[in-house]
């Protein structure tokens, strides 16, 4: 082996096997691109992304760790979400969750109060 050499294993790596998934249609209603990382609690993404936020509670993008999805202004695209593992204790950067994802009504109420598009669809 050469120092620094990477020798990936052959074959396909499966991620998030056995976890519940959902597809959601997301529209960027803002005037700037928005990028969302792989493990960001999806209900807490930028308030200018419009989608059914209730469907995103306890979910993150079903993409490889360390990657992201970019939404251009005016763009609409379907993404797949996957549930978080473990005890579903999530602390989002917009303080909608702050702990358990099992308090859906409280999380949605905070999203509505904060002007997050798509939260009012509950």
Swiss-Prot record:
Signal peptide: none
Enzyme class: hydrolase
InterPro entries named in the record: Urease_beta-like, Urease_betasu_sf, Urease_subunit
Major place of residence: cytoplasm
Pathway(s): Nitrogen metabolism; urea degradation; CO(2) and NH(3) from urea (urease route): step 1/1
Domain of life: Bacteria
GO term, biological process aspect, one: urea catabolic process
Gene3D superfamilies found in the cross-reference section: Urease, beta subunit
Catalytic activity entry: urea + 2 H2O + H(+) = hydrogencarbonate + 2 NH4(+)
GO MF annotations, alphabetized: urease activity
Alphabetically ordered keywords of this record: Cytoplasm, Hydrolase
Record EC number: 3.5.1.5
Locations listed in the record: Cytoplasm
Gene Ontology terms: cellular component: urease complex
PANTHER family: UREASE
Subunit structure: Heterotrimer of UreA (gamma), UreB (beta) and UreC (alpha) subunits. Three heterotrimers associate to form the active enzyme.
Family, per entry: Belongs to the urease beta subunit family.
Protein name: Urease subunit beta
Gene expressing this chain: ureB
């Amino acid at each position: 082996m050469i120092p620094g050499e990477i020798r990936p294993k052959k074959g396909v790596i499966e991620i998030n096997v056995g976890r519940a998934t959902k597809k959601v249609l997301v529209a960027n209603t803002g005037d700037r691109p928005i990028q969302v990382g792989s493990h960001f609690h999806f209900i807490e993404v930028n308030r200018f992304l419009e989608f059914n936020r209730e469907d995103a509670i306890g979910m993150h993008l079903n993409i490889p760790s360390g990657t992201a999805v970019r939404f251009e202004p005016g763009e609409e695209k379907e993404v797949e979400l996957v549930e978080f593992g473990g005890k579903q204790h999530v602390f989002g950067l917009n303080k909608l969750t702050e702990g358990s994802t099992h308090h859906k009504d409280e999380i949605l109420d905070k999203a509505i109060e904060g002007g997050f598009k798509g939260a009012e669809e509950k």
